[in-house]
Amino acid sequence: MALWVKLLITVVVSYLVGNINFALVLSRIKHGDIRHSGSGNPGTMNVVRTYGKVVGVVCLLLDAFKAAVPAFFFWWLCAGNPYDISDKLGLYVSGLSVVVGHIFPVFLKFKGGKGIACIIGISLLAHPFVTLIAFAVGLIFLIVVKIGALASFIMIFSPNIYEAISLGGTQPAVSALIFAMMTLAVLAHHANLVRLFSGTENLTVLFRFGKKKGQK
């Protein structure tokens, strides 16, 4: 099969998989609609705020898994040598397509989540150790500072910058796909950044330490 045919299949299938919004699915299971709760965003952070940490973790894992499964398959399919894991074109074509499908889902009138969990799933395939460290640092930042958008950027930018540097210009198409994926994630957080700079950003409180004054 010609490479362009493989890539076309990769884009279409991955985009459609990206349309599956687990935040919305989980909220339906809870007899609600995440789009009408909290910030209105059908994504992990809003699930945490609305339904709690356990459901939020489930949402994160499902969205990461949703991106990782097709990316792994198409990474293998599109490689010149199926056992050459350094050829990452299929991985990132699939990854970007899933993210586009997640942010702009045709079945939800192009109003989806922000793609962070999906990008984490892709990054775990490419550089699991670096991604886990970045996730841990971002999680600590979230617990302390409580700003979800910035914590998310820590989680996704660190492993992808590492990937771009490690490629060293050997796969310019892959570097371009990584740049496009990061740009989409930032643009998806436009409203968060506006609120952040105006001092009105929603806080995500994972843990409450101590008790308020007057509480027994």
Show which residues each predicted segment covers.
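Loop-to-transmembrane alpha-helix initiation sites
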Residues: 132, 148-155, 170-181
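Short, non-helical or kinked segments that cap or interrupt transmembrane helices
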Residues: 33-44, 107-120, 147-155
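Interfacial segments of multi-pass membrane proteins
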Residues: 48-52, 74-78, 115-145, 157-166
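Cytosolic, membrane-interface loops and tails of multi-pass inner-membrane proteins
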Residues: 24-55, 194-216
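C-terminal ends of transmembrane helices
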Residues: 23-26, 101-111, 138-145, 190-194
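Nucleotide and nucleotide-moiety/phosphate-recognizing core
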Residues: 6, 55-61, 65-106, 126-130, ...
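Alpha-helical transmembrane segments of multi-pass membrane proteins
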Residues: 14-17, 97-102, 138-142, 159, ...
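N-terminal signal-anchor transmembrane alpha helix
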Residues: 5-29
